[in-house]
Each structure stands twice: as structure tokens, then as C-alpha cells.
Amino acid sequence: MYLFDSLKDVAQEYLTEPQIEALRQSYVVARDAHEGQTRSSGEPYIIHPVAVARILAEMRLDLETLQAALLHDVIEDCDVTKEDLDAHFGSSVAELVDGVSKLDKLKFRDRKEAQAENFRKMVLAMVQDIRVILIKLADRTPNMRTLGALRPDKKRRIARETLEIYAPLAHRLGIHNIKTELEELGFEALYPNRYRVLKEVVKAARGNRKEMIQRIHSEIEGRLQEVGLPARVVGREKNLFSIYNKMKTKEQRFHTIMDIYAFRIVVDTADTCYRVLGQVHSLYKPRPARMKDYIAVPKANGYQSLHTSMVGPHGVPVEVQIRTEDMDQMADKGVAAHWSYKANSERGGTTAQIKAQRWMQSLLELQQSAGNSFEFIENVKSDLFPDEIYVFTPKGRIVELPMGATAVDFAYAVHTDIGNTCVGARVDRTPYPLSQSLKSGQTVEIISAPGARPNAAWLNYVVTSRARTKIRQVLKTMRREDSITLGRRLLNHALGEHSVNEIAPENISKVLSDLKIASMDDLLAAIGLGELMSIVIARRLLGNADELTEPSKSGGNKNKLPIRGAEGILLTFANCCHPIPDDHIIAHVSPGRGLVVHRETCPNVRGYQKEPDKYMAVEWTKDYDQEFITELKVDMHNRQGALAELTNVISKTGSNIHGLSTEERDGRLYTVTVLLTTKDRVHLAGIMRKIRTMPHALKVRRRKN
């Protein structure tokens, strides 16, 4: 029982005698179940579950969690069933052990799929009972401590998985001590040489800093004693992985990171925190822009503290965190601080526990709308390490977003419907680009319009997984709706004098059956997406090719499909020729892209008369309602200010420039290629006339192909 005694010493500090006895019984079952089994390192297997349970006991977790930790491998590795555990220890312990075991049982085609699906399963188990992930994190820690016994490739894989998933999860749940240990062990296993070198230089640097650390410590402590503010002042050392990350991601030099002297001041009440802040600011010159109040507005993982940055003795940077004892516990243990497990409840609990519960609920929504495990893991990873900003709604509600979030992210954070109908934003009462990042303290107002729909381009700049998932969801629906609408138009056009509604039901049923397509909507969607040709389907539906429209022989406008330019995401204007209203146009259906419109003179569609079935006669309607992009080439003298004059002239015509490039022809001349917006050929002719009046413009022409 000597192994159990090491766990008992910690657990008896907060568990009752009957609970310790119940824990001992769990240990005996686990010990007997693992009899004769050893770890990769050669040590008896039972050492591992005891180490896991001890980590959780140090976090003061409840009896059921400690029992499940001792038993977490018995279902997987031994002849013990979930029913056995239920009979001996109750359903709660059995469910916890089963939840942890299931994460390791899954079999997949490849390692990448396994990691993605395992992660999805882990998150779902965590949403059911957060203790599952606490056991999993505690399980990972001793595994990382004993990595030395594994093959180098396996060691690297586990270390990378730990740094990418488990350490960020511990951070997101606010469990600082586990997060720090996992990062250090993962860093050492993945990059042993970098770890060793960095450890040596950090050790040397810390030795040189002792005198300055002692001086700042004494000055802060002395000032607080002078004014009668009892406090505990401790120096903070950055861990090696944190230093390495800053050097890599922020491209900071080693001495820049090590030159910062960091301290933590722990006091009794939140009110004292602010009084201490005033005293340290009177001692050293503060940097106002670097002051952060995480007490009034806690971080996403429940972390609370005042952060301030100051200029210390001899100009050295001094960083101070000020917090209460409770906040210090929370910063170290996160959701496990003041542990009291309440199933499916947000009522009560610490800030960290409530925020974790909300976060996990949002993960459940992500899982339900994600297309697959890879999409899910991509979305959740973006939420694991958020540097937060805090912005306000016009009514003063605080909205917490990750750093880099845009007005679109804000809109979806407020409500899905607001995000879906967003057409613009005002920040601090001023128009603000949807793609531009927000900053803390801004007041954001979303301009929405009924009937507006998400834009696929938003996916290029949103940063929250919620926004990304909701946008993809709507785009999938839009794509289907648009493909059905376009498919109906294409089929009606191919049917000539007939329409889809006139086709006999038995004909439709036969075609659907022959093609193994479930419904008419699916058939229309396949036509709209270019997977089936409308002319072929029309022939099969009618059974009489003579009644069909022949696009190549129809000179009259009545057989041309009208184009407005706003048909949806399944109508594309070809980039090779940039057609605009009043151009003679031709179209073809491209698989997956829908209808692609070209100018008739475009080299890419020159052979359309030879393959009439692949092309469709189209024409512009009179009520097109958008701007179109086209391309101009301008030959100019190489003179200072000529390019600026060109862009100014284009701007005055009401056109926007979407792209611009230059090509030097010789020392005196160059050609400017401009992508710009225009309403139609008349508008474009006006733009070209204005350019021709420029003194440095020699020739302006529209790109032919």
C-alpha cells in the first residue's frame, strides 16, 4: 500500500475518512486489475494511475474524479467492464472511466484522421462532464514525464500533439500549472537541442539579474508596508517554452525578453488591488497603454488580475500582476479552483467554471454544424489560445472577442441572424470596413438589411470559429438554393416551348429512377452545378428532340437566357475576358461553378459553334443591378506623377480600382493594366474618354481576351 500512501497524504487534507476508505478500495481494484502489467519504462503499471490521481488530488478534485483517475485504464487494458465499475463504485465513476477509455479505443485509416476524430470525441465527452478532460490532462502529464522510454518518432508525435492540443486546452480551462508543465516537457521532447541551449543561457541570465530583482522586490515591499497595505510580493520567472515562443512568433531577441523584470503582488481584496496599483505607479513611471484590468473584465478562461507595465530603476522594464489570493488560486487551477461539480449547470461556481461551461456549450454548437472532424478541429484550435479584446454594443453590453476579430465576428457573437444579414458596420459612430480588426474599447454597431446574405469573402478575414462555421453553413444552403434556381432556368430554357411544370410526372419519375437521383430538386441542383447537361435531361424528359431549343441555330432573342448579374453564387463572369453589360455574351455550365459567362470574342469560347450542346445563348436584361469588373491597358509616358493622375481620373468617373500593375516597355514608356468597376459599356466608354485626355496617356484599350 506504499503507493496509495503518497495519494492518501494529499487527499486526506480535504477528504473525509469514509471518502479515503472508498478511495483505497478503488486503488485495490486498480492494483489487482493491472497486476503483472508494466509501462514502456519497465515500472509497474499501477504507478501511472496513482500519479494521475495525485495530480487531481493536488487540485482538490472530488472523490469520484480521483476514483475514476485510479481506474481510468481498467476497461481498456483489463478484464473489467463498465457494469462491474457501476456495481462497485456507482454510475458516475463508471461513466467517467468509460468516457476516458472511449477516447483511446477508436481506430482510423490514418494518424491524421485519428487525431482529428479523437479530438472531436474528447471535446464531446468534456461537454458531457468536464471531469473527463481534467482526468485526460492529468493522464497526459505523467505520460510526458516518462517519454524517454519511447521511440524517437513516437516521442515527437506525442510531444507535438501535447503542444498543439493538450497544453492549449489546459490554458483555455485556466489550469496554469498543468499547462506550464506540459509545455516544458513537450518543448524538451520535440526540440531537445533548442531546449538545452535555451535552458543554459536562461540559467546564466537569471544569475546576472539577482541584484536588480532583489532591489525592485525590496522597493515594492517597502512602499506597501509604508502605507499599511499587507501583500505578498513574488518574482515571476517566464518558462522556457514561453521565452522560445516569443522569440519565434514575435521575433524578439533573447535579451529583450529577459530584460523584463516581472513580479506578482497578492493581496486580500479586489479593492486593495486598485490601491496597490496606485502605489506602484507612484513608485515607478507607468506606461498607460500597457495597463490592463482583467478584474473588471476577466479573460475567456476566467483569469482575473491587474496588469501594469512601468519604467523601473535605471530604465529597466518592470511588469507587475496584482491579484487577490482567490484570483491567484484561479490563475493556477482554473476550473478546478474551489471545485464543486454541478452537472449541466451554470448556476453558481467560479468565474472560470461558468466561462468554461459556456465555452463548452459553444463547442457543442460547432460540432453540430461542422462538416467533418478536420473542420471541427480547425475551428476549435482557433479558439484555444485567444488573446482577447473587449468591445461594446451600442447599448453598453461588453462582447469578448479574440485579438484580430472583425465587425463580422462581432455580428455573429451578438446573434447569428445579425451576422447573416450584416451589410456594414459603424465603429464609434464612424463607418468601418468589415474586414478591419477591432480594438478594445470600441463601440460597434452592425448595419443589417433584410434579405442580405453572407459573403464567401468573409471567410478570408473572420477569426472566430462561430463566425466561420455559421458562414459556411449558410453558404452551403445558398449554394444548393442557387443551384436549384439556376438548374430550373437552364432546364426551362433547354425545354424550349415547354416548361418543367408541364412535364408528365411519370416521365420525371423514370428519369430520376434511371439516373438514381432522389428528387426533382436534386436533379435541378445537379444541372445548376454543371454535373448534368440541361439539353440532355430535357431530351430524356420529353422523349422528342425535335421539340427542343437548338442554341446554335436560334438567332432570335426569345431563345436567349436573360442574365441580370445578381443570380447568386452560381453565376460567374469569366476572368479571362471580363464581360460587362451590352457586350455580346455566351455561357457554358462548368462542373461545380454553375454558369460561366464569356464575351463572344473570347478566345476561350471560339469553338462554341462546333459544340453547341456545351454552350448557351445568353443576353443582358435591362434591369441589371450591380457593378462589373473589367480590365483596361493604358500606354503612358514614364513621367513623375503620371500614375497618380491616372488613378485620380478613374476615381472621378465613379469607378473603383480593384487591381493595378505596370510593365516597363523602354526607359520612356510603360503600360499600366487596371482592373476597375464599371456599370456597362457606356460607362466604360466615358472612363476611356477621360483617360485619353490626360497629357501623358498615349493609348487606352480594353483587354481583348
Swiss-Prot record:
Q: Which cofactor does it need?
A: Mn(2+)
Q: Which SUPFAM superfamilies match?
A: ACT-like (SSF55021), HD-domain/PDEase-like (SSF109604), Nucleotidyltransferase (SSF81301), TGS-like (SSF81271)
Q: In which pathway does it act?
A: Purine metabolism; ppGpp biosynthesis; ppGpp from GDP: step 1/1
Alphabetically, the GO molecular function entries are:
GTP diphosphokinase activity; guanosine-3',5'-bis(diphosphate) 3'-diphosphatase activity
Q: Name the catalysed reactions.
A: guanosine 3',5'-bis(diphosphate) + H2O = GDP + diphosphate + H(+)
**Pfam families given for it?**
ACT_4, HD_4, RelA_AH_RIS, RelA_SpoT, TGS
EC id: 3.1.7.2
What's this protein's family per the entry? Belongs to the RelA/SpoT family.
What function does the entry list? In eubacteria ppGpp (guanosine 3'-diphosphate 5'-diphosphate) is a mediator of the stringent response that coordinates a variety of cellular activities in response to changes in nutritional abundance.
Q: What is this protein called?
A: Guanosine-3',5'-bis(diphosphate) 3'-pyrophosphohydrolase
Species: Vibrio cholerae serotype O1 (strain ATCC 39315 / El Tor Inaba N16961)
State the organism's lineage: Bacteria, Pseudomonadati, Pseudomonadota, Gammaproteobacteria, Vibrionales
